[in-house]
């Protein structure tokens, strides 16, 4: 059985992510134990809250270097994806620097912030996360900050401006939306992470 570990960042709604995997029949463990994280087959980096609070908690739990050195697949969700970039404008804090790019506040285009609700996602590169999911499917977003499209974007969305809905580099994958709140498409994405992303 695949060992799936949810990294306890100390500021995330971990239970909803765990329940999403439970519904799919996968066993997961929530932990910040370094040895368990290092030995996991697949890892989830969730996040709700602010980038500076999350980075502070990761530093306090001595997780930053551990995460940076992981070689197994890691899926960052929402703030977890933003933490994978180099820097976040939210609190002006250096982040994990796993994937190039910066997280900036969504520009004021007259739309309310945070973006909260369903939005269309366009796949721009082949990625196993989206295997079997129809192009321009809808996923559920809650965010005021985003990563501009770059060479590591595998999907984009638009909320006044285009932004990265998903990024990937080597073993690190990130999604700006909440798959655990995105119905069948989100469930399939989580299943794809477990079953289609190689490790």
From Swiss-Prot:
GO terms for cellular component: cytoplasm
Occurrences of domain Glutamine amidotransferase type-1 (ranges): 3-199
E.C. numbers: 4.3.2.10, 3.5.1.2
Molecular function via GO: glutaminase activity; imidazoleglycerol-phosphate synthase activity; lyase activity
Primary site of residence: cytoplasm
Complex and partners: Heterodimer of HisH and HisF.
This protein's name: Imidazole glycerol phosphate synthase subunit HisH
Keyword Hydrolase part of the UniProt annotation: yes
Active-site residues, as the UniProt record annotates them: 78, 178, 180
Keyword Cytoplasm tagged: yes
Catalytic reaction(s) noted: 5-[(5-phospho-1-deoxy-D-ribulos-1-ylimino)methylamino]-1-(5-phospho-beta-D-ribosyl)imidazole-4-carboxamide + L-glutamine = D-erythro-1-(imidazol-4-yl)glycerol 3-phosphate + 5-amino-1-(5-phospho-beta-D-ribosyl)imidazole-4-carboxamide + L-glutamate + H(+); L-glutamine + H2O = L-glutamate + NH4(+)
Pathway(s) the chain acts in: Amino-acid biosynthesis; L-histidine biosynthesis; L-histidine from 5-phospho-alpha-D-ribose 1-diphosphate: step 5/9
Gene label: hisH
Record keywords, A-Z: Amino-acid biosynthesis, Cytoplasm, Glutamine amidotransferase, Histidine biosynthesis, Hydrolase, Lyase
InterPro entries named in the record: Class_I_gatase-like, GATASE, Imidazole-glycPsynth_HisH
Record-level GO BP terms: L-histidine biosynthetic process
Compartments where found: Cytoplasm
Function: IGPS catalyzes the conversion of PRFAR and glutamine to IGP, AICAR and glutamate. The HisH subunit catalyzes the hydrolysis of glutamine to glutamate and ammonia as part of the synthesis of IGP and AICAR. The resulting ammonia molecule is channeled to the active site of HisF.
